[in-house]
Protein backbone atom coordinates (compact mmCIF):
# COMPACT_ATOMS: atom_id res chain seq x y z
CA UNK A 1 0.00 0.00 0.00
CA UNK A 2 1.70 3.23 -1.12
CA UNK A 3 2.50 5.57 1.75
CA UNK A 4 1.47 3.17 4.51
CA UNK A 5 3.78 0.64 6.05
CA UNK A 6 4.73 -0.54 9.51
CA UNK A 7 8.36 -1.35 8.65
CA UNK A 8 10.73 -0.19 5.95
CA UNK A 9 14.23 -1.43 5.22
CA UNK A 10 16.98 0.03 3.07
CA UNK A 11 20.65 -0.96 2.81
CA UNK A 12 20.51 -2.88 6.06
CA UNK A 13 18.72 -0.13 8.00
CA UNK A 14 15.40 -0.94 9.71
CA UNK A 15 12.87 1.78 10.45
CA UNK A 16 9.38 1.55 11.92
CA UNK A 17 6.62 4.12 11.87
CA UNK A 18 5.84 5.26 15.40
CA UNK A 19 2.20 4.25 15.58
CA UNK A 20 1.68 6.09 18.86
CA UNK A 21 1.84 9.36 16.90
CA UNK A 22 -0.45 8.38 14.03
CA UNK A 23 -2.52 9.65 12.33
CA UNK A 24 -1.37 13.22 12.92
CA UNK A 25 2.39 12.73 12.72
CA UNK A 26 4.31 10.22 10.62
CA UNK A 27 7.63 9.62 12.34
CA UNK A 28 10.01 6.80 11.47
CA UNK A 29 12.26 5.40 14.19
CA UNK A 30 15.45 3.53 13.38
CA UNK A 31 15.78 0.15 15.08
CA UNK A 32 19.42 -0.85 15.33
CA UNK A 33 19.53 -3.07 18.43
CA UNK A 34 17.60 -5.97 19.93
CA UNK A 35 16.83 -3.79 22.94
CA UNK A 36 15.29 -1.09 20.75
CA UNK A 37 13.12 -3.67 19.00
CA UNK A 38 11.96 -5.04 22.35
CA UNK A 39 11.08 -1.56 23.59
CA UNK A 40 9.25 -0.65 20.37
CA UNK A 41 7.13 -3.80 20.59
CA UNK A 42 6.43 -3.53 24.32
CA UNK A 43 5.58 0.18 24.19
CA UNK A 44 3.35 -0.41 21.13
CA UNK A 45 5.25 1.93 18.84
CA UNK A 46 4.73 -1.03 16.53
CA UNK A 47 1.83 -3.45 17.03
CA UNK A 48 -0.09 -6.10 15.18
CA UNK A 49 0.97 -9.72 15.61
CA UNK A 50 2.46 -10.21 12.10
CA UNK A 51 4.27 -6.85 12.19
CA UNK A 52 6.01 -7.46 15.50
CA UNK A 53 7.09 -10.92 14.32
CA UNK A 54 8.60 -9.34 11.20
CA UNK A 55 10.41 -6.70 13.25
CA UNK A 56 11.86 -9.32 15.59
CA UNK A 57 13.11 -11.46 12.70
CA UNK A 58 14.55 -8.50 10.78
CA UNK A 59 16.30 -7.16 13.88
CA UNK A 60 18.01 -10.49 14.52
CA UNK A 61 19.05 -10.61 10.84
CA UNK A 62 20.38 -7.04 10.97
CA UNK A 63 22.27 -7.72 14.19
CA UNK A 64 24.02 -10.71 12.62
CA UNK A 65 24.71 -8.87 9.35
CA UNK A 66 26.56 -6.15 11.22
CA UNK A 67 28.47 -8.78 13.18
CA UNK A 68 29.68 -10.46 9.97
CA UNK A 69 30.96 -7.13 8.68
CA UNK A 70 32.64 -6.07 11.92
CA UNK A 71 36.41 -5.91 12.23
CA UNK A 72 37.49 -7.34 14.55
CA UNK A 73 34.86 -10.07 14.54
CA UNK A 74 32.76 -10.21 17.75
CA UNK A 75 33.49 -12.97 20.23
CA UNK A 76 30.14 -14.70 19.69
CA UNK A 77 31.24 -15.64 16.16
CA UNK A 78 34.18 -17.61 17.56
CA UNK A 79 32.35 -20.94 17.32
CA UNK A 80 28.94 -22.40 16.49
CA UNK A 81 28.20 -22.94 20.18
CA UNK A 82 29.06 -19.38 21.22
CA UNK A 83 26.88 -18.09 18.40
CA UNK A 84 24.04 -20.39 19.44
CA UNK A 85 24.19 -19.22 23.05
CA UNK A 86 24.28 -15.58 21.94
CA UNK A 87 21.36 -15.81 19.51
CA UNK A 88 19.18 -17.95 21.78
CA UNK A 89 19.55 -15.34 24.51
CA UNK A 90 18.35 -12.60 22.17
CA UNK A 91 15.46 -14.72 20.89
CA UNK A 92 14.29 -15.47 24.43
CA UNK A 93 14.53 -11.80 25.37
CA UNK A 94 12.61 -10.36 22.43
CA UNK A 95 9.92 -13.02 22.83
CA UNK A 96 9.02 -11.52 26.23
CA UNK A 97 7.94 -8.19 24.72
CA UNK A 98 4.28 -9.21 24.20
CA UNK A 99 3.17 -12.60 25.52
CA UNK A 100 -0.25 -13.04 23.88
CA UNK A 101 0.77 -12.64 20.22
CA UNK A 102 1.80 -16.14 19.12
CA UNK A 103 3.32 -14.88 15.84
CA UNK A 104 6.23 -13.41 17.75
CA UNK A 105 6.93 -16.76 19.37
CA UNK A 106 6.49 -18.54 16.04
CA UNK A 107 9.10 -16.30 14.43
CA UNK A 108 11.61 -16.77 17.23
CA UNK A 109 11.04 -20.55 17.27
CA UNK A 110 11.54 -20.67 13.52
CA UNK A 111 14.89 -18.91 13.85
CA UNK A 112 15.81 -21.15 16.77
CA UNK A 113 15.06 -24.24 14.67
CA UNK A 114 17.24 -22.99 11.81
CA UNK A 115 19.98 -22.29 14.33
CA UNK A 116 19.77 -25.81 15.76
CA UNK A 117 19.69 -27.45 12.32
CA UNK A 118 22.70 -25.49 11.11
CA UNK A 119 24.71 -26.32 14.23
CA UNK A 120 23.88 -30.02 13.87
CA UNK A 121 24.89 -29.88 10.21
CA UNK A 122 28.40 -28.95 11.30
CA UNK A 123 28.44 -25.50 9.73
CA UNK A 124 30.85 -22.86 11.00
CA UNK A 125 29.60 -19.81 12.90
CA UNK A 126 29.64 -17.45 9.93
CA UNK A 127 27.68 -19.85 7.73
CA UNK A 128 25.13 -20.32 10.51
CA UNK A 129 24.76 -16.55 10.81
CA UNK A 130 24.11 -16.35 7.06
CA UNK A 131 21.38 -19.00 7.39
CA UNK A 132 19.71 -16.98 10.14
CA UNK A 133 19.91 -13.76 8.13
CA UNK A 134 18.20 -15.38 5.15
CA UNK A 135 15.48 -16.87 7.34
CA UNK A 136 14.86 -13.58 9.15
CA UNK A 137 14.37 -11.72 5.88
CA UNK A 138 12.12 -14.47 4.54
CA UNK A 139 9.82 -14.26 7.58
CA UNK A 140 9.18 -10.63 6.69
CA UNK A 141 8.95 -10.99 2.91
CA UNK A 142 6.44 -13.85 2.87
CA UNK A 143 3.89 -11.92 4.95
CA UNK A 144 2.42 -9.76 2.16
CA UNK A 145 1.77 -12.69 -0.18
CA UNK A 146 -0.01 -14.77 2.42
CA UNK A 147 -2.07 -11.75 3.52
CA UNK A 148 -3.40 -11.36 -0.01
CA UNK A 149 -4.16 -15.08 -0.18
CA UNK A 150 -6.16 -15.17 3.05
CA UNK A 151 -7.96 -11.94 2.16
CA UNK A 152 -9.08 -13.45 -1.14
CA UNK A 153 -10.11 -16.74 0.52
CA UNK A 154 -12.18 -14.92 3.13
CA UNK A 155 -13.83 -12.51 0.71
CA UNK A 156 -14.76 -15.24 -1.77
CA UNK A 157 -16.17 -17.46 1.00
CA UNK A 158 -18.24 -14.58 2.37
CA UNK A 159 -19.64 -13.72 -1.07
CA UNK A 160 -20.56 -17.38 -1.58
CA UNK A 161 -22.49 -17.42 1.70
CA UNK A 162 -24.56 -14.42 0.73
CA UNK A 163 -25.04 -15.66 -2.84
CA UNK A 164 -26.55 -18.83 -1.37
CA UNK A 165 -29.07 -16.58 0.41
CA UNK A 166 -30.05 -14.90 -2.84
CA UNK A 167 -27.84 -11.82 -2.53
CA UNK A 168 -25.33 -12.65 -5.25
CA UNK A 169 -25.36 -9.14 -6.71
CA UNK A 170 -25.30 -7.21 -3.45
CA UNK A 171 -22.34 -5.30 -2.14
CA UNK A 172 -21.50 -5.98 1.50
CA UNK A 173 -21.25 -3.99 4.71
CA UNK A 174 -18.46 -5.41 6.88
CA UNK A 175 -17.47 -4.38 10.40
CA UNK A 176 -14.03 -4.86 11.90
CA UNK A 177 -12.31 -4.32 15.25
CA UNK A 178 -8.92 -2.77 16.01
CA UNK A 179 -6.41 -2.43 13.15
CA UNK A 180 -5.43 -5.35 10.94
CA UNK A 181 -4.16 -3.66 7.78
CA UNK A 182 -0.76 -2.65 6.45
CA UNK A 183 0.16 -1.01 9.76
CA UNK A 184 -0.38 -4.30 11.61
CA UNK A 185 1.46 -6.49 9.10
CA UNK A 186 4.18 -6.23 6.46
CA UNK A 187 1.51 -5.17 3.98
CA UNK A 188 -2.13 -5.46 2.85
CA UNK A 189 -3.43 -6.88 6.12
CA UNK A 190 -5.58 -9.74 7.39
CA UNK A 191 -9.18 -8.84 8.30
CA UNK A 192 -8.73 -5.36 6.85
CA UNK A 193 -7.19 -7.08 3.85
CA UNK A 194 -10.48 -8.95 3.36
CA UNK A 195 -12.30 -5.61 3.37
CA UNK A 196 -9.72 -4.17 0.97
CA UNK A 197 -10.17 -7.13 -1.39
CA UNK A 198 -13.94 -6.62 -1.43
CA UNK A 199 -13.38 -2.94 -2.23
CA UNK A 200 -10.87 -3.68 -4.99
CA UNK A 201 -13.26 -6.15 -6.62
CA UNK A 202 -16.23 -3.79 -6.39
CA UNK A 203 -18.13 -5.85 -3.80
CA UNK A 204 -17.86 -3.63 -0.70
CA UNK A 205 -20.67 -1.26 0.18
CA UNK A 206 -19.11 0.15 3.33
CA UNK A 207 -16.61 -0.71 6.04
CA UNK A 208 -17.45 -0.09 9.69
CA UNK A 209 -14.83 -0.10 12.44
CA UNK A 210 -14.79 0.33 16.20
CA UNK A 211 -12.61 2.92 17.89
CA UNK A 212 -10.93 0.09 19.83
CA UNK A 213 -10.14 1.92 23.03
CA UNK A 214 -8.08 2.57 25.07
CA UNK A 215 -5.34 2.70 22.40
CA UNK A 216 -7.77 3.76 19.67
CA UNK A 217 -6.24 1.49 17.03
CA UNK A 218 -9.49 1.81 15.11
CA UNK A 219 -10.01 5.56 15.27
CA UNK A 220 -6.31 6.34 14.77
CA UNK A 221 -4.98 3.60 12.50
CA UNK A 222 -7.84 1.85 10.71
CA UNK A 223 -9.41 5.24 9.98
CA UNK A 224 -6.07 6.40 8.55
CA UNK A 225 -5.70 3.33 6.34
CA UNK A 226 -9.27 3.38 5.02
CA UNK A 227 -9.05 7.09 4.32
CA UNK A 228 -5.77 6.60 2.44
CA UNK A 229 -7.33 3.82 0.36
CA UNK A 230 -10.49 5.85 -0.31
CA UNK A 231 -12.61 3.01 1.07
CA UNK A 232 -16.06 4.21 2.19
CA UNK A 233 -16.17 3.74 5.94
CA UNK A 234 -17.85 4.67 9.20
CA UNK A 235 -16.33 4.76 12.68
CA UNK A 236 -18.32 3.79 15.76
CA UNK A 237 -17.61 3.78 19.48
CA UNK A 238 -17.03 0.35 21.00
CA UNK A 239 -20.30 0.63 22.93
CA UNK A 240 -22.31 1.23 19.72
CA UNK A 241 -21.86 -2.20 18.09
CA UNK A 242 -25.25 -3.48 19.24
CA UNK A 243 -26.97 -0.36 17.98
CA UNK A 244 -25.23 -0.71 14.61
CA UNK A 245 -26.39 -4.31 14.25
CA UNK A 246 -29.96 -3.31 15.11
CA UNK A 247 -30.15 -0.41 12.68
CA UNK A 248 -27.90 -1.29 9.73
CA UNK A 249 -27.65 -4.25 7.39
CA UNK A 250 -24.26 -5.59 8.43
CA UNK A 251 -23.32 -8.66 6.39
CA UNK A 252 -20.27 -9.80 8.37
CA UNK A 253 -17.79 -9.03 11.10
CA UNK A 254 -14.16 -9.71 10.17
CA UNK A 255 -11.44 -9.60 12.82
CA UNK A 256 -7.81 -10.56 13.12
CA UNK A 257 -6.22 -12.69 15.83
CA UNK A 258 -3.21 -12.74 18.09
CA UNK A 259 -3.60 -16.42 18.96
CA UNK A 260 -5.97 -19.17 17.81
CA UNK A 261 -6.11 -22.40 19.81
CA UNK A 262 -6.49 -25.94 18.52
CA UNK A 263 -10.28 -25.85 18.93
CA UNK A 264 -10.69 -22.38 17.38
CA UNK A 265 -10.93 -20.18 20.48
CA UNK A 266 -9.41 -16.86 19.47
CA UNK A 267 -7.57 -14.16 21.39
CA UNK A 268 -7.80 -10.74 19.79
CA UNK A 269 -8.01 -7.09 20.76
CA UNK A 270 -10.24 -6.56 23.77
CA UNK A 271 -13.76 -5.84 22.57
CA UNK A 272 -13.73 -8.64 19.99
CA UNK A 273 -15.67 -10.96 22.31
CA UNK A 274 -18.35 -8.29 22.79
CA UNK A 275 -18.72 -7.97 19.02
CA UNK A 276 -18.92 -11.76 18.62
CA UNK A 277 -21.70 -12.10 21.19
CA UNK A 278 -23.71 -9.36 19.51
CA UNK A 279 -23.05 -10.79 16.04
CA UNK A 280 -24.35 -14.18 17.19
CA UNK A 281 -27.49 -12.52 18.58
CA UNK A 282 -28.12 -10.87 15.20
CA UNK A 283 -27.07 -13.93 13.14
CA UNK A 284 -24.23 -12.04 11.47
CA UNK A 285 -21.30 -14.17 10.22
CA UNK A 286 -18.24 -13.67 12.42
CA UNK A 287 -14.98 -14.37 10.60
CA UNK A 288 -11.43 -14.60 11.97
CA UNK A 289 -8.67 -13.89 9.44
CA UNK A 290 -5.08 -14.69 10.43
CA UNK A 291 -1.95 -16.43 9.13
CA UNK A 292 -1.16 -20.05 9.91
CA UNK A 293 1.52 -18.83 12.33
CA UNK A 294 -1.24 -17.46 14.57
CA UNK A 295 -2.68 -20.95 15.15
CA UNK A 296 -1.21 -22.49 18.30
CA UNK A 297 -1.89 -26.22 18.16
CA UNK A 298 -0.11 -26.70 21.49
CA UNK A 299 -2.98 -24.98 23.30
CA UNK A 300 -6.25 -26.90 23.45
CA UNK A 301 -8.57 -24.00 24.20
CA UNK A 302 -8.77 -20.37 25.19
CA UNK A 303 -8.49 -20.95 28.93
CA UNK A 304 -4.73 -21.47 28.51
CA UNK A 305 -4.01 -18.34 26.47
CA UNK A 306 -1.85 -15.86 28.44
CA UNK A 307 -3.62 -12.50 28.46
CA UNK A 308 -1.46 -9.40 28.59
CA UNK A 309 -2.61 -6.64 30.93
CA UNK A 310 -1.43 -3.15 30.09
CA UNK A 311 -0.53 -0.43 32.63
CA UNK A 312 -3.55 1.24 34.25
CA UNK A 313 -2.41 4.68 33.10
CA UNK A 314 -2.95 3.71 29.47
CA UNK A 315 -6.70 3.48 30.10
CA UNK A 316 -6.74 6.86 31.83
CA UNK A 317 -5.10 9.04 29.19
CA UNK A 318 -5.57 9.76 25.50
CA UNK A 319 -3.21 11.34 22.98
CA UNK A 320 -4.13 13.34 19.90
CA UNK A 321 -3.86 16.59 18.00
CA UNK A 322 -4.89 19.73 19.82
CA UNK A 323 -8.26 21.05 18.70
CA UNK A 324 -8.76 23.45 16.99
CA UNK A 325 -5.84 22.03 15.03
CA UNK A 326 -2.70 24.13 15.03
CA UNK A 327 0.80 23.51 13.76
CA UNK A 328 4.24 24.18 15.17
CA UNK A 329 7.14 26.00 13.50
CA UNK A 330 7.95 22.89 11.45
CA UNK A 331 4.41 22.57 10.15
CA UNK A 332 3.58 19.56 12.32
CA UNK A 333 0.28 19.27 14.14
CA UNK A 334 0.70 19.94 17.83
CA UNK A 335 -0.23 16.92 19.95
CA UNK A 336 -0.83 16.40 23.64
CA UNK A 337 -1.57 13.62 26.10
CA UNK A 338 -4.44 14.39 28.46
CA UNK A 339 -5.91 12.52 31.42
CA UNK A 340 -9.63 11.78 31.08
CA UNK A 341 -10.17 10.21 34.52
CA UNK A 342 -9.70 11.45 38.08
CA UNK A 343 -6.16 10.99 39.32
CA UNK A 344 -5.36 8.06 41.56
CA UNK A 345 -8.13 5.65 40.63
CA UNK A 346 -8.12 2.68 43.00
CA UNK A 347 -8.78 0.10 40.30
CA UNK A 348 -8.44 -0.05 36.53
CA UNK A 349 -9.14 -3.23 34.57
CA UNK A 350 -7.08 -3.03 31.39
CA UNK A 351 -6.53 -6.33 29.54
CA UNK A 352 -5.17 -5.89 26.04
CA UNK A 353 -6.99 -8.95 24.69
CA UNK A 354 -10.08 -11.07 25.25
CA UNK A 355 -10.92 -14.58 24.07
CA UNK A 356 -13.80 -15.32 21.72
CA UNK A 357 -15.02 -18.94 22.09
CA UNK A 358 -15.07 -21.02 18.92
CA UNK A 359 -18.84 -21.49 19.22
CA UNK A 360 -19.32 -17.78 18.40
CA UNK A 361 -17.04 -17.89 15.33
CA UNK A 362 -18.52 -18.73 11.93
CA UNK A 363 -15.30 -19.27 9.98
CA UNK A 364 -11.54 -19.13 10.46
CA UNK A 365 -9.47 -18.10 7.44
CA UNK A 366 -5.75 -18.56 6.83
CA UNK A 367 -3.63 -18.40 3.68
CA UNK A 368 -4.44 -22.10 3.19
CA UNK A 369 -8.21 -21.73 3.09
CA UNK A 370 -11.38 -21.47 5.17
CA UNK A 371 -12.43 -23.70 8.06
CA UNK A 372 -15.99 -23.99 9.32
CA UNK A 373 -17.45 -26.15 12.06
CA UNK A 374 -19.12 -29.44 11.28
CA UNK A 375 -22.89 -29.52 11.76
CA UNK A 376 -23.78 -29.78 15.41
CA UNK A 377 -20.25 -29.05 16.67
CA UNK A 378 -19.15 -26.00 18.63
CA UNK A 379 -15.41 -26.21 17.92
CA UNK A 380 -13.23 -26.27 14.83
CA UNK A 381 -11.01 -28.87 13.20
CA UNK A 382 -8.25 -26.64 11.82
CA UNK A 383 -6.13 -29.36 10.21
CA UNK A 384 -7.23 -28.33 6.70
CA UNK A 385 -5.95 -24.76 7.05
CA UNK A 386 -2.69 -25.10 8.98
UniProtKB/Swiss-Prot annotation:
The active site is at 258 (proton donor). The keyword Oxidoreductase does not apply. The record marks 178 as: Transition state stabilizer. Keywords: Amino-acid biosynthesis, Cytoplasm, Isomerase, Methionine biosynthesis, Nucleus. It is an enzyme of class 5 (isomerase). Its EC number is 5.3.1.23. GO terms for molecular function: S-methyl-5-thioribose-1-phosphate isomerase activity. One of its GO terms (cellular component) is nucleus. Disulfide bonds: none annotated. It is found in: Cytoplasm; Nucleus. GO terms for biological process: L-methionine salvage from methylthioadenosine. It catalyses: 5-(methylsulfanyl)-alpha-D-ribose 1-phosphate = 5-(methylsulfanyl)-D-ribulose 1-phosphate. PANTHER family: METHYLTHIORIBOSE-1-PHOSPHATE ISOMERASE (PTHR43475:SF1). Catalyzes the interconversion of methylthioribose-1-phosphate (MTR-1-P) into methylthioribulose-1-phosphate (MTRu-1-P). Belongs to the eIF-2B alpha/beta/delta subunits family. MtnA subfamily. This is Methylthioribose-1-phosphate isomerase. The lineage of its organism: Eukaryota, Fungi, Dikarya, Basidiomycota, Agaricomycotina.
